[in-house]
Regions:
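Generic structural signal for well-ordered alpha-helices
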Residues: 141, 178, 205-209, 231, ...
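Core AdoMet radical
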Residues: 160-177, 181-276, 282-286, 292, ...
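Glycine-enriched alpha-helix->loop->beta-strand junction motifs that scaffold or abut catalytic
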Residues: 235-241, 280-282, 356, 376-383
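Catalytic cores of alpha/beta
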Residues: 228-236, 293-307, 367-377
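Conserved, mostly hydrophobic/aromatic
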Residues: 125, 153, 191, 244, ...
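Canonical Radical SAM [4Fe-4S] cluster-binding loop centered on the CxxxCxxC motif
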Residues: 131-173
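An N-cap/entry alpha-helix motif that binds or orients negatively charged groups
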Residues: 100-137
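Auxiliary Fe-S-binding modules of radical SAM enzymes
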Residues: 1-114, 311-434
Length: 434
């Protein structure tokens, strides 16, 4: 497999952002005992804040909808009980031999025992990709419409404690951005905001989605989690699907990383996809931010979360994103913990083999070489013409700063040509409304 030959160790391109001035962090006893403590994320300010009184990250805040569901308990229990070191080569080969794979098979495919068999796994994943998606690669682009945020997520460039330029697009600016994107030929758009109900309320997002429907055939949102009735409203405004990153499924680590704001509430975020499906959304996307914690356990929990949702809501469409941690403004030291390119390939292939019908996106966080090869092997959806700043598609100068650094700056035209060179079929829209 030619693509396998191009998957090498992690890209070590030099960071371009100014590092945070305070890099020496005094670890707590809990952090010292944590084998997956990612020191690159923490700075002195975060360490100081974490010693203050913090709210219970498992307690719902006022106005948050509570579902009568057991999915959270099932997923967290399975994640905590997942001992990937107990799996053997025989377990991995057994998983590869199955036509329909179980959660136990998925666990084996994510284990260290699977790495020596990565080429065989990739070939199997490629066959599943061909079976369900043929040579198709679906294109989309993100549109960041606001970067105000009320959360304190210490690894995120938008977090409320990070000193960046903030902006929110008005109606005229939204139209200008959408027209600029539409002129490239793009027909699917993903609308994103920072997590601030005050500065980017649901009505504002809904109005942006109504505008987007005038220019694009498919509209998705990646915003702060909302209640079922609010997802229903956004669906009425033209939204087809909702993506929410859980970031990490390790509840204790989640509490260390999300120090303030609505995002601190772990269960409310976990149930976002279920509320979206109840609100009438056609599809939902899930992801862990690989490198925040033990990536194998987080990938296992992500896959199991989607699996259980699919059993409960068989009409829904499900998708995975596979992001790795990236540097941000004011901290260029951030890096994914032990998630090199071989490990990333293992995760994406495991997703494909476990839920072969699910869409898999590889974002512009990855370099062009890795993205192209993953499309050839197991992924089927790619972003193009990406700008994570506010107003970056049409303005000569961004109105607001970006969320994180990207590693693939290619235009739609350039990625379209790259896919054709790989004998893949670019697809700009998969749906027709009648």
């Amino acid at each position: 497999m030619n693509a396998m030959n191009n998957i090498s160790e992690v890209n070590t391109a030099p960071a371009t952002r100014q590092a945070s001035a305070a890099q020496n962090v005094v670890k707590t006893d809990e952090q010292k005992a944590d084998a997956f403590f990612n020191e690159s994320i923490f700075d002195a300010e975060a360490a100081s804040f974490s010693h203050k009184h913090l709210t219970d990250h498992m307690a719902y805040q006022e106005g948050m909808e509570v579902l009568d569901s057991t999915l959270l308990d099932e997923v967290i229990a399975a994640r905590d009980g997942y001992d990937y070191n107990r799996y053997t080569e025989a377990d991995v080969r057994r998983a590869l031999a199955h036509e329909q794979r179980t959660p136990a098979d998925f666990a084996a495919l994510l284990s260290p025992a699977a790495l020596p068999l990565l080429e065989e796994i990739a070939r199997s994943a490629q066959r599943e990709r061909q079976r369900y998606f043929g040579n198709n690669v679906t294109f989309f682009t993100p549109l960041y419409i606001a970067n105000y945020c009320e959360n304190y997520c210490i690894y995120c460039g938008f977090n409320s404690h990070n000193r960046i330029h903030r902006a929110r697009l008005n109606r005229e600016q939204l139209i200008t951005e959408m027209e600029a994107i539409a002129k490239t030929g793009m027909q699917e758009i993903l609308i994103l905001t920072g997590e601030s109900r005050k500065m980017s309320d649901v009505h504002y997002i809904g109005e942006a989605c109504k505008l987007a429907r005038q220019y694009f055939k498919v509209v998705g949102v990646e915003i702060y989690p909302v209640n079922s009735d609010e997802y229903a409203y956004l669906h009425e405004c033209g939204v087809d699907y909702v993506t929410v990153f859980q970031e990490t499924y390790n509840s204790a680590k989640y509490a260390q990383l999300h120090l303030a704001g609505a995002k601190r509430v772990f269960p409310y975020r976990f149930y976002a996809q279920e509320r979206a499906l109840r609100g009438g959304m056609r599809g939902v996307g899930l992801a862990a931010l690989l490198g925040l914690d033990d990536f194998r356990k987080d990938a296992f929990a992500t896959g199991l979360h989607a699996y259980l949702l699919q059993k409960k809501y068989p009409h829904g469409e499900f998708a995975f994103s596979c992001p790795r941690l990236r540097p941000i403004i004011n901290n260029d030291k951030i890096k994914p913990l032990d998630v090199h390119e071989r490990q990333l390939l293992q995760v994406v292939c495991a997703y494909r083999l476990f839920l072969p019908f699910a869409s898999i996106t590889v974002s512009s966080r990855e370099c062009a070489r890795v993205r192209d090869n993953l499309m050839l092997i197991c992924a089927n959806k790619i972003s193009a013409g990406v700008n994570t700043g506010i107003g970056g598609h049409s303005a000569k100068q961004e109105l607001g700063d970006e969320q994180f650094e990207i590693d693939d700056n290619r235009s739609l035209e350039e990625i379209y040509a790259a896919m054709e060179r790989l004998h893949l079929q670019p697809v700009l829209a998969e749906y027709v409304y009648v």
